[in-house]
Amino acid sequence: MSKEVLSEKVSVNINTSTLSQIDLLVDNGYYSNRSDFINHALRSALDENRSTIDRLIEQNQKRSGTDHAWFIGVSGYTAKEIDEMFESGEKTTVLGYGVFMLDHNCDAEKVFAVIESIKVRGKTVCSPEIKKHYGLK
Protein backbone atom coordinates (compact mmCIF):
# COMPACT_ATOMS: atom_id res chain seq x y z
CA MET A 1 0.00 0.00 0.00
CA SER A 2 0.99 3.62 -0.43
CA LYS A 3 3.12 5.31 2.18
CA GLU A 4 1.40 8.68 1.66
CA VAL A 5 0.57 10.69 4.78
CA LEU A 6 -2.91 9.80 5.98
CA SER A 7 -4.00 13.30 6.90
CA GLU A 8 -5.70 16.22 5.20
CA LYS A 9 -5.43 19.94 5.68
CA VAL A 10 -8.73 21.58 6.66
CA SER A 11 -9.48 25.30 6.75
CA VAL A 12 -11.65 26.44 9.65
CA ASN A 13 -13.01 29.90 10.36
CA ILE A 14 -12.65 30.70 14.07
CA ASN A 15 -13.81 33.96 15.59
CA THR A 16 -11.19 36.23 17.12
CA SER A 17 -12.40 35.77 20.68
CA THR A 18 -12.10 31.97 20.48
CA LEU A 19 -8.73 32.14 18.72
CA SER A 20 -7.36 34.50 21.36
CA GLN A 21 -8.25 31.98 24.08
CA ILE A 22 -6.53 29.19 22.12
CA ASP A 23 -3.45 31.40 21.71
CA LEU A 24 -3.40 32.13 25.44
CA LEU A 25 -3.31 28.39 26.19
CA VAL A 26 -0.60 27.82 23.56
CA ASP A 27 1.53 30.72 24.80
CA ASN A 28 1.36 29.37 28.33
CA GLY A 29 2.45 25.86 27.35
CA TYR A 30 -0.83 23.96 27.61
CA TYR A 31 -0.61 23.03 23.91
CA SER A 32 2.36 23.08 21.55
CA ASN A 33 0.50 25.07 18.88
CA ARG A 34 -2.96 25.84 17.50
CA SER A 35 -3.10 22.56 15.57
CA ASP A 36 -2.30 20.61 18.74
CA PHE A 37 -5.20 22.33 20.52
CA ILE A 38 -7.62 21.75 17.62
CA ASN A 39 -6.64 18.07 17.29
CA HIS A 40 -7.10 17.59 21.04
CA ALA A 41 -10.52 19.28 20.91
CA LEU A 42 -11.59 17.12 17.97
CA ARG A 43 -10.51 13.90 19.68
CA SER A 44 -12.41 14.94 22.82
CA ALA A 45 -15.56 15.68 20.80
CA LEU A 46 -15.27 12.31 19.03
CA ASP A 47 -14.82 10.56 22.40
CA GLU A 48 -17.97 12.28 23.70
CA ASN A 49 -19.89 11.02 20.66
CA ARG A 50 -18.40 7.49 20.65
CA SER A 51 -21.72 5.69 21.26
CA THR A 52 -23.39 7.60 18.41
CA ILE A 53 -20.46 6.87 16.09
CA ASP A 54 -20.52 3.17 17.01
CA ARG A 55 -24.27 3.00 16.38
CA LEU A 56 -23.92 4.72 12.99
CA ILE A 57 -21.09 2.37 11.99
CA GLU A 58 -23.24 -0.64 12.87
CA GLN A 59 -26.23 0.76 10.95
CA ASN A 60 -24.12 1.46 7.85
CA GLN A 61 -22.52 -1.97 7.93
CA LYS A 62 -25.92 -3.68 8.15
CA ARG A 63 -27.38 -1.48 5.43
CA SER A 64 -24.50 -1.97 3.00
CA GLY A 65 -24.98 -5.73 2.60
CA THR A 66 -22.45 -8.27 1.43
CA ASP A 67 -21.87 -6.80 -2.03
CA HIS A 68 -20.49 -3.58 -0.59
CA ALA A 69 -17.12 -2.91 1.01
CA TRP A 70 -18.15 -0.38 3.69
CA PHE A 71 -15.46 1.09 5.91
CA ILE A 72 -14.49 3.89 8.25
CA GLY A 73 -10.82 4.75 8.76
CA VAL A 74 -8.32 3.23 6.34
CA SER A 75 -9.11 0.47 3.86
CA GLY A 76 -8.04 -0.76 0.48
CA TYR A 77 -6.99 -3.63 -1.73
CA THR A 78 -3.63 -4.99 -2.74
CA ALA A 79 -2.97 -6.11 -6.30
CA LYS A 80 -3.13 -9.72 -5.06
CA GLU A 81 -6.59 -9.16 -3.51
CA ILE A 82 -7.88 -7.59 -6.73
CA ASP A 83 -6.49 -10.54 -8.73
CA GLU A 84 -8.21 -13.03 -6.38
CA MET A 85 -11.52 -11.16 -6.58
CA PHE A 86 -11.24 -11.01 -10.37
CA GLU A 87 -10.52 -14.75 -10.63
CA SER A 88 -13.51 -15.62 -8.43
CA GLY A 89 -15.85 -13.27 -10.34
CA GLU A 90 -16.50 -11.22 -7.22
CA LYS A 91 -17.90 -7.71 -7.63
CA THR A 92 -18.10 -5.01 -4.99
CA THR A 93 -18.98 -1.39 -4.39
CA VAL A 94 -16.71 0.63 -2.11
CA LEU A 95 -18.45 3.00 0.32
CA GLY A 96 -16.73 4.67 3.22
CA TYR A 97 -15.29 7.45 5.28
CA GLY A 98 -11.55 7.96 5.53
CA VAL A 99 -8.81 6.76 3.20
CA PHE A 100 -9.25 4.08 0.54
CA MET A 101 -6.08 2.81 -1.14
CA LEU A 102 -5.42 0.62 -4.14
CA ASP A 103 -1.89 -0.54 -4.89
CA HIS A 104 -0.52 1.47 -7.79
CA ASN A 105 0.47 -1.81 -9.47
CA CYS A 106 -3.15 -3.05 -9.60
CA ASP A 107 -4.25 -3.99 -13.11
CA ALA A 108 -6.76 -1.25 -13.97
CA GLU A 109 -8.95 -3.51 -16.12
CA LYS A 110 -9.27 -6.01 -13.27
CA VAL A 111 -10.12 -3.18 -10.85
CA PHE A 112 -12.85 -1.96 -13.24
CA ALA A 113 -14.25 -5.50 -13.49
CA VAL A 114 -14.26 -6.03 -9.71
CA ILE A 115 -15.19 -2.61 -8.27
CA GLU A 116 -18.46 -1.25 -9.62
CA SER A 117 -18.15 2.13 -7.91
CA ILE A 118 -16.06 3.96 -5.32
CA LYS A 119 -17.66 6.56 -3.05
CA VAL A 120 -15.37 7.77 -0.28
CA ARG A 121 -15.87 10.76 1.96
CA GLY A 122 -12.19 11.50 2.44
CA LYS A 123 -9.26 10.50 0.28
CA THR A 124 -8.72 7.85 -2.38
CA VAL A 125 -5.15 6.82 -3.19
CA CYS A 126 -4.79 5.03 -6.53
CA SER A 127 -3.47 5.49 -10.06
CA PRO A 128 -4.65 8.47 -12.13
CA GLU A 129 -6.32 6.07 -14.60
CA ILE A 130 -8.44 4.52 -11.84
CA LYS A 131 -9.29 7.93 -10.39
CA LYS A 132 -10.44 9.12 -13.80
CA HIS A 133 -12.57 6.00 -14.40
CA TYR A 134 -14.47 6.44 -11.12
CA GLY A 135 -14.60 10.25 -11.28
CA LEU A 136 -12.43 10.68 -8.17
CA LYS A 137 -10.37 13.72 -7.25
Language-model features: locations:
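Short, basic amphipathic alpha-helical segments that act as recognition/interaction helices
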Residues: 2-3, 20-21, 28, 32-56
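Short Lys/Arg-rich basic patches
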Residues: 1-17, 26
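Detector for repetitive beta-architecture
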Residues: 62-63, 74, 93, 97-99, ...
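Short, T/G/N/S-enriched strand-turn elements that build extracellular solenoid repeat scaffolds
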Residues: 65, 80-93, 104-117, 132-137
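Short, positively charged interaction helices/loops
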Residues: 47-85
